[in-house]
């Protein structure tokens, strides 16, 4: 609703794959709806446990315990990244996962695989 009240190039969206999913949205549909406002994207996967506890709640999650590709949101992440590539988006993607060295390595590997 916010975007309907303001016509400004300065009002932008920071999209988050995990928060869109947890809130009960289809992340790709949500991204497509607001693509023209997108300035930044957080790429976050979500564990099965968190999904069971919070899916459909009007909330966001600060970070995730699972690496990208290791949770239930992996397919949505793939679809969103593919859409961003198809639409020639050139903004910033931020990986969001709690930082064990292994989680970070797996997340970067997963995202690199999608970006080629």
Residue ranges and their predicted role:
Residues 3-15, 20-116:
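Histidine-acidic metal/acid-base catalytic patches
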């Amino acid at each position: 609703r916010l975007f309907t009240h303001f016509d400004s190039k300065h009002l932008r969206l920071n999209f988050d794959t995990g928060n869109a999913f947890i809130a009960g949205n289809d992340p790709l549909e949500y991204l497509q709806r607001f693509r023209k406002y997108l300035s930044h994207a957080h790429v976050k996967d979500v564990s099965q446990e968190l999904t069971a506890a919070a899916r459909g709640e009007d909330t966001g999650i600060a970070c995730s315990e699972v690496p990208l590709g290791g949770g239930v949101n992996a397919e949505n992440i793939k679809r969103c990244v593919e859409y961003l590539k198809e639409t020639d988006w050139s903004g910033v993607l931020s990986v969001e996962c709690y930082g064990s060295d292994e989680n970070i390595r797996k997340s970067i590997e997963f995202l690199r695989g999608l970006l080629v």
